[in-house]
């Protein structure tokens, strides 16, 4: 600093304004001197404060230690001012016995219920639990669990309260089956003996007597694992099971039922959906008889898309030397959760090497990808999902098959493309099936004589065997009751049209089709698919279905509307606009029968022209045999 001032002084001496700069220099030196002195002063004060603080703390620790040491014997050496604390076996020191800060009174943890969409599986379960309680003349208060006591059990994860709730229970009789394929039963509350508990039992059937292990408690029900079956339900047919992972995997919950029983169970699922979410329609008897569920031509080997996945350990853990589990969610066996965790994987994934619901070529692809993953899993920093999508090629009999297959298909250990040849007898063509793993690759499906191209990662129905049945059912129900040629359905609006499946397959029955889809890529594929199939009366629009009818100019009395929304169902604004448009017929296709029931009641009871329509039919279609899933088609017509 002083060298800087000397240089400045030399510079000032050789300038014309010597006096001015000398005065400025002196002022600067004074200012810097004052600042330096103040810094030194506060540094010294800080050191003194620290020394006094640590001396005081050490003094307190020292005397506190002497006091504690006398508590087990004589109190003669305790200072008089502190003697009363020893006599009363209490300490008035602001520090604890160990010299640490006084521990605060622990705060009680409160259970926070998560917000659940009412038509989601968790939301539907609430209705099913209430239905069970009603049938058993029980109130919700009589099955309410003390979740707070479990949350605040500080002894250990296996504390006395947890052990009382999470225990083995023998000879439990299953009373009902849920829409998710789980059994429902009642057991005694182990803590509040005057109460009962509703228990969910995976793979339990009405009439089963089983032994279970409760492992998780919710306010109004508990979850359990099925340990063994003591007495079998008349419905249970274990001889029908083909999946070696049954009872462990969440993929095929109903495999131990006859197919007729599966179809009837799914019909009841649709009935209960309208019972829970359309109670006014039930009370006013506005629902038609529920038709039998339409069977799938294939009950096994039908899925054209599967998505096995895996998890990797957190970064803090050491690198894996063994490949983590690659497969699907496990269900019903707690030891499997432990086994997978022991090798560093995620406790909810079951390692599988085949899927009985997937097509033959997808199982070949799964074998190929598992072998590839065995070599490359160390390159992954986190878990991922592997796409396996079937691709169809219409073969030219005059050319070798391998020359007609896409280069990006899954390959075996020899580097050859894995494929399966099948014959379409109805259309008199031969098809080659390959497995695609790139979500951006364009794949082809062949449905009801039409060819559809779309990105492998985009949505498309996964059971091609039942698709021609569904498209024909929709096509046959487009026409409103005949009231003369002027009232004939001439136009079709396909909301949520995707890549154009229902638009193109229904195009022959009407003069004009308008499809709308929020995805520009899907609309692009829909336009290309219409052109490739020689369909000229289809027009596709990019936009939200909620604003669809702003651009529709076809007369409503001659127009039918197809709805095929995602699982969450339709927006209320869209349903109001649909009612204002007042079409001649509405065909509502849904992969979530619960949101469908909710939407249908809202449309009929809450919208402007809803009362001008009535339900003509409700029918289920079994897109996913051996599972609890069912799709429903509700047809409404203008009166």
Swiss-Prot record:
CDD domains in alphabetical order: AdoMet_MTases (cd02440)
Q: Which residues form the active site?
A: 591 (nucleophile), 631 (proton acceptor)
The biological processes this protein is annotated with in GO are: methylation; tRNA modification
- List the catalysed reactions: uridine(54) in tRNA + S-adenosyl-L-methionine = 5-methyluridine(54) in tRNA + S-adenosyl-L-homocysteine + H(+)
Instruction: Name the residues that bind S-adenosyl-L-methionine.
Output: 461, 496, 517, 564
- SUPFAM superfamilies assigned to the protein according to its UniProt record, in alphabetical order: Nucleic acid-binding proteins (SSF50249), S-adenosyl-L-methionine-dependent methyltransferases (SSF53335)
| InterPro entries noted in UniProt | MeTrfase_TrmA_AS (IPR030390), MeTrfase_TrmA_CS (IPR030391), NA-bd_OB-fold (IPR012340), SAM-dependent_MTases_sf (IPR029063), TRAM_dom (IPR002792), tRNA_(uracil-5-)_MeTrfase (IPR025795), U5_MeTrfase_fam (IPR010280)
Q: What is the effect of changing residue 498 to D?
A: Unable to methylate tRNA
PANTHER family registered for this protein in UniProt:
RNA M5U METHYLTRANSFERASE, TRNA (URACIL(54)-C(5))-METHYLTRANSFERASE
- Its protein name is tRNA (uracil(54)-C(5))-methyltransferase
Top-down, what is the taxonomic lineage of the species of origin?
Answer: Eukaryota, Fungi, Dikarya, Ascomycota, Saccharomycotina
């Amino acid at each position: 600093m002083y060298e800087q001032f000397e240089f400045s002084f030399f510079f000032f001496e050789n300038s014309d304004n010597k006096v001015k700069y000398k005065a400025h220099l002196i002022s600067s030196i004074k200012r810097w001197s004052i600042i330096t002195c103040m810094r030194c002063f506060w540094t010294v004060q800080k050191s003194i404060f620290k020394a006094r603080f640590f001396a005081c703390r050490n003094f307190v620790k020292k005397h506190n230690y002497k006091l504690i040491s006398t508590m087990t014997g004589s109190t003669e050496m305790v200072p008089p001012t502190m003697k009363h604390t020893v006599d009363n076996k209490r300490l008035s020191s602001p520090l604890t016995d160990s010299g640490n800060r006084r521990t605060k009174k622990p705060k009680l943890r409160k259970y926070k219920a998560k917000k659940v969409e009412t038509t989601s599986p968790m939301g539907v379960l609430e209705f099913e639990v209430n239905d069970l309680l009603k049938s058993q003349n029980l109130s919700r208060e009589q099955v309410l669990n003390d979740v707070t006591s479990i949350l605040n059990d500080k002894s250990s994860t296996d504390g006395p309260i947890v052990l009382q709730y999470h225990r083995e229970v023998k000879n439990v009789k299953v009373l009902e089956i849920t829409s998710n394929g789980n059994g429902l039963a009642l057991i005694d509350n182990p803590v509040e003996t005057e109460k009962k508990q509703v228990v969910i039992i995976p793979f339990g059937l009405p009439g089963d007597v089983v032994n279970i292990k409760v492992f998780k408690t919710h306010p109004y029900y508990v979850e359990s694992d099925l340990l063994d079956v003591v007495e079998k339900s008349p419905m249970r047919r274990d001889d029908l099971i083909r999946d070696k992972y049954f009872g462990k995997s969440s993929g095929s919950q109903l495999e131990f039922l006859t197919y007729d029983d599966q179809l009837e169970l799914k019909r009841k699922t649709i009935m209960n959906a309208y019972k829970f979410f359309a109670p006014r329609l039930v009370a006013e008897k506005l629902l038609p008889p529920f038709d039998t569920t339409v069977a799938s031509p294939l009950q096994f080997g039908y899925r054209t898309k599967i998505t096995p996945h895996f998890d990797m350990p957190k970064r803090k853990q050491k690198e894996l030397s063994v490949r983590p589990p690659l497969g699907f969610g496990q269900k019903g066996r707690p030891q499997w959760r432990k086994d997978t965790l022991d090798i560093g994987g995620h406790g909810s994934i079951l390692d599988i090497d085949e899927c009985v619901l997937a097509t033959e070529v997808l199982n070949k692809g799964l074998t190929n990808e598992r072998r590839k993953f065995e070599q490359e899993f160390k390159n992954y920093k986190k878990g991922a999902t592997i796409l396996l999508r079937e691709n169809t090629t219409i073969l030219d009999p005059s050319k070798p098959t391998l020359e007609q297959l896409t280069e990006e298909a899954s390959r075996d250990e020899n580097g050859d493309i894995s494929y399966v040849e099948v014959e379409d007898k109805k259309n008199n063509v031969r098809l080659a099936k390959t497995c695609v793993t790139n979500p951006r690759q364009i794949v082809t499906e062949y449905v009801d004589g039409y060819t559809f191209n779309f990105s492998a990662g985009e949505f498309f129905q996964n059971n091609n065997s039942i698709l021609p049945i569904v498209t024909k059912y929709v096509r046959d129900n487009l026409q409103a009751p005949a009231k003369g040629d002027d009232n004939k359905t001439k136009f079709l609006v396909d909301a949520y049209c995707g890549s154009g499946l229902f638009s193109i397959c229904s195009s022959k029955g009407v003069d004009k089709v308008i499809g709308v889809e929020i995805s520009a890529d899907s609309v692009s594929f829909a336009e290309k698919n219409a052109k490739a199939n020689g369909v000229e009366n289809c027009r596709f629009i990019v936009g939200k279905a909620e604003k669809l009818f702003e651009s529709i100019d076809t007369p409503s009395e001659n127009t039918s509307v197809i709805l095929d929304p995602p699982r969450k169902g339709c927006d209320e604004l869209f349903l109001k606009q649909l009612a204002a448009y007042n079409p001649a017929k509405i065909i509502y296709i849904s992969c979530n029968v619960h949101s469908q029931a909710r939407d249908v009641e809202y449309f009929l009871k809450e919208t402007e022209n809803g009362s001008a329509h009535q339900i003509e039919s409700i029918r289920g279609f079994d897109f996913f045999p051996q599972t609890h899933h069912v799709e429903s088609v509700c047809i409404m017509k203008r009166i």
